[in-house]
């Protein structure tokens, strides 16, 4: 209930203290389910793609959408446009696949599922963010138009055809032009070719990052607006568009066009007529009563047969053999669930180590951290090597 009360407090303050009394439109991160406390989480996109089952993705997002709708979220910011081209990329899990056709079908399903429950979708990121140089996040995509059209445009076209109301521009540049400054990409391609009529949203502070090219934050805001960006995210540049008009960098009509797109969506959402939420009603989505997410996770797994006892598991637990579970993620629930995951309670899931203890005798299991994720510690590594080299001794 606190989220609904907070929503109404924000809405009331804006309506009562702003000059025109225009209601706010709330957005929330939803790359694989709702990134909020007690949010209904889905498996990461890479696993969802491994199901090859768009209907299951659609069903899971329908549940997630119900929760978002009940919490007053108007826009779900959803990862679905990135096609994985380099597995070194740290955000690989946000991609459904390395295949543009499969990625497009999953994007389509995600949009339909979410919007069936009420919230609109901002599909991200456009375009070619999965093509970064050397797998470095937000680095340049060194490709041409053929690769764009064959590999990176299909998911966006599918999301737009499915009814996505928003597109988020990507951080990267393509052939030397930043996506947030690429009018061909944000106007000619998605609006004229794909028929998109919603809003184009910037990624976080991406407009301000154009300063590295323009050297002037006011110019950066004007450039992004002229290139087709309608809504900024955390940046300062769009707050300076009035100065950009005074300096002749943009015309008021260009700002009016962006404002019109935003106001149109607010009217379509009914926010002017019904700006507040009913504060009663359930917003927690129990996984037992809503098993779609768990089913999606199960269908994305590949079960391997342990032929010839290649893996050190045995049916006879009285054999006296031991199991070493090594690695910093083996007993860390949060690290199992991918990026864009909210803080969790310890009893919200089972770690790899927990699962091993459910099957085998706890006395037969030895957990070794092995290393830290963000710093080097030779002692932890030496301990793990020693135990695994002489298993009979522990």
Task: For every predicted segment, state its role.
Residues 1-394:
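Glycoside hydrolase catalytic-domain context in secreted enzymes
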């Amino acid at each position: 209930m606190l989220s609904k009360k907070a929503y109404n407090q924000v809405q009331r303050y804006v309506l009562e203290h702003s000059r025109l009394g225009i209601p706010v439109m709330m957005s929330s991160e939803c790359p694989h389910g709702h990134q909020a406390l007690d949010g209904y989480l889905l498996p990461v996109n890479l696993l969802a793609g491994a199901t090859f089952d768009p209907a299951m993705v659609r069903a899971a997002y329908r549940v997630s959408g119900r929760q978002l709708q009940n919490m007053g979220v108007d826009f779900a910011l959803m990862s679905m446009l990135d096609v994985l081209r380099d597995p070194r990329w740290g955000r690989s899990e946000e991609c459904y696949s390395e295949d543009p056709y499969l990625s497009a079908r999953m994007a389509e399903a995600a949009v339909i599922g979410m919007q069936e429950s009420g919230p609109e979708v901002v599909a991200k990121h456009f375009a070619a963010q999965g093509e970064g140089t050397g797998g470095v996040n937000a680095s340049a995509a060194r490709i041409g138009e053929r690769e764009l059209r064959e590999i990176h445009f299909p998911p966006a076209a599918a999301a737009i055809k499915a009814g996505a109301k928003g597109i988020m521009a990507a951080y990267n540049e393509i052939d030397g032009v930043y996506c947030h400054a690429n009018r061909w990409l944000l106007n000619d391609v998605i609006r004229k070719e794909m028929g998109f009529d919603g809003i184009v949203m910037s990624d976080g502070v991406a407009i301000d990052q154009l300063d590295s090219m323009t050297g002037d934050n006011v110019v950066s805001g004007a450039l992004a607006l002229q290139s087709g960006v309608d809504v900024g995210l955390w940046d300062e540049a769009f707050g300076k568009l009035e100065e950009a008009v005074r300096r002749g960098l943009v015309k008021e009509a260009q700002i009016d066009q962006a404002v019109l797109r935003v106001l149109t969506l607010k009217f379509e959402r009914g926010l002017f007529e019904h700006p507040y939420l009913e504060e009663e009603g359930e917003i927690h989505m129990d996984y037992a009563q809503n098993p779609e997410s768990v089913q999606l996770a199960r269908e994305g797994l590949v079960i391997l047969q342990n032929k010839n006892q290649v893996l050190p598991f045995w049916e006879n637990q009285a054999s006296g053999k031991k199991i070493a579970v090594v690695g910093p993620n083996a007993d860390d629930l949060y690290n199992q669930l991918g990026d864009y995951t909210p803080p969790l309670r310890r009893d919200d899931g089972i770690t790899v180590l927990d699962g091993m203890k459910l099957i085998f005798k706890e006395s037969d299991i030895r957990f070794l951290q092995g290393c830290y994720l963000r710093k080097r510690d030779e002692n932890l590594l030496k301990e793990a090597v020693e135990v695994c080299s002489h298993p009979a001794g522990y």
